[in-house]
């Protein structure tokens, strides 16, 4: 299984910030963030491993992950201490997860909060589910197009799998 072996993938990475404890990578779409049997070795995890020079004691510590089809800044802690600090910060008002999305169909309101629980549908699919986990997405429509699409600014209050997709489809 190629996913079980860490394999350097020398992709050209855009790294807008790096210090001894933290690396911030501009993850391109459609690059997967982590290795898995389905993704093979072409992942951000393998690219970061190569970027850091293939250290012997490498542990991949993403602070949060972006879906395969999502591009954006993704923080990766370079040690356990920073990972713990960032994980604590992740659930505070100080850590802002904001996105721009083009939606098929525009939200009815120009701005609002989608506060609907998200649960598992089948496998990795997610949906609005009364018994699901709480999920909060703040949104503001920046531009509406004649074709029904919209450019929407989104800020996550929680970080559920596929939260933006599920909430924008609700």
Predicted regions and their residues:
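RNA pseudouridine synthases
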Residues: 1-170
């Amino acid at each position: 299984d190629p996913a079980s072996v860490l394999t350097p993938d020398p992709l050209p990475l855009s790294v807008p910030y790096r210090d001894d404890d933290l690396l911030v990578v501009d993850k391109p779409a459609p690059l997967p963030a982590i290795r898995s049997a389905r993704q093979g070795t072409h992942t951000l995890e393998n690219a970061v491993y190569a970027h850091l020079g293939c250290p012997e004691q490498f542990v991949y510590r993403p602070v949060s992950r972006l879906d395969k089809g999502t591009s954006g800044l993704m923080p990766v802690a370079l040690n356990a201490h920073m990972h713990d600090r960032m994980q604590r910060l992740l659930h505070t008002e100080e850590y802002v997860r904001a996105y721009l999305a083009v939606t098929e169909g525009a939200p009815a309101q120009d701005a609002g909060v989608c506060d609907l629980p998200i649960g598992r549908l089948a496998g990795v699919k997610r949906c609005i589910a009364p018994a699901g986990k709480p999920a909060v997405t703040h949104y503001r429509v920046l531009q509406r197009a004649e074709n029904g699409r919209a450019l929407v600014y989104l800020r996550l209050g929680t970080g559920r799998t596929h939260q933006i997709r599920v909430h924008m489809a609700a």
